[in-house]
């Protein structure tokens, strides 16, 4: 549970904005969406290998220019 202390005379909009910023930093929504669908570890590993190969090809392409 997030606790946001409100200072004396602080605008409620500012306190709400601080709460939203802190909520985003915790990554609760991101984690919830990630857990909604299970992805097999082999699929994750394959995607990581494909991404690494893509990035490597991009870097090699930039070096040749």
UniProtKB/Swiss-Prot annotation:
GO cellular component annotations of the record: ribonucleoprotein complex; ribosome
GO biological process, one term: translation
Keyword match Nucleotide-binding: no
Domain of life assignment: Bacteria
An annotated Gene Ontology molecular function: structural constituent of ribosome
Protein name (record): Small ribosomal subunit protein bS21
Family named by the database record: Belongs to the bacterial ribosomal protein bS21 family.
Species: Flavobacterium psychrophilum (strain ATCC 49511 / DSM 21280 / CIP 103535 / JIP02/86)
UniProt keyword Ribosomal protein, yes or no: yes
Keyword terms of this UniProt record: Ribonucleoprotein, Ribosomal protein
Source species taxonomy: Bacteria, Pseudomonadati, Bacteroidota, Flavobacteriia, Flavobacteriales
Encoding gene per record: rpsU
InterPro entries listed in its UniProt record: Ribosomal_bS21, Ribosomal_bS21_sf
